[in-house]
Amino acid sequence: MTDPIEQAFERIRAEAMRRNGSVPDLNKNDAFRRPPAPKGGVEKRKKGRASGLDGRQKRYVRGAESLGSVLNKEIQRRGWGKDIAGGWVTSNWEELVGAKIAQHTRVEMIKDKKLFITCDSTAWATNLRMMQRQILQVIAEKVGPNIITELRIFGPQAPSWRKGPLHVKGRGPRDTYG
């Protein structure tokens, strides 16, 4: 009993032999040789694009640089490295400090190598001040040294008594609560 796949393959080869007059010899390892010249003698050159052994168009290598290397050179040439690194710190704050700390803190801005951070409570601000050295080490490992050299950590903002866009100067301190 023969394999149905082998039978189908032989039928396809027989049909190709009927149409083309020849089929490649599968017993030889010389798959890279040129097909025989036509019976008329001189072989006409075919027009079209050259293709590789798999039939795909050959790559034309011009020595072009990759997009990433071109962007990196341009970033260095324009001096944007520190700005991009600062943006990375702001957008990846949770990755730098962990989910628990990031849940209670927020990066406000980066100015003159200083990272300004606001915390939900004074307790979180105190804890972050204790961890300041470790946070700066992680930032230096991820984005490089001398990008951020100092953390400015603030607690929550006190509530304001002002309401609305306009403000009249107050009358000074009063005995409000008592």
Swiss-Prot record:
Residues 16-55 are annotated as: Disordered. It comes from the Bacteria. NCBIfam families: PRK00111.1. HAMAP family: UPF0232. Belongs to the UPF0232 family. This is UPF0232 protein Cgl0005/cg0006. It comes from Corynebacterium glutamicum (strain ATCC 13032 / DSM 20300 / JCM 1318 / BCRC 11384 / CCUG 27702 / LMG 3730 / NBRC 12168 / NCIMB 10025 / NRRL B-2784 / 534). The lineage of its organism: Bacteria, Bacillati, Actinomycetota, Actinomycetes, Mycobacteriales.
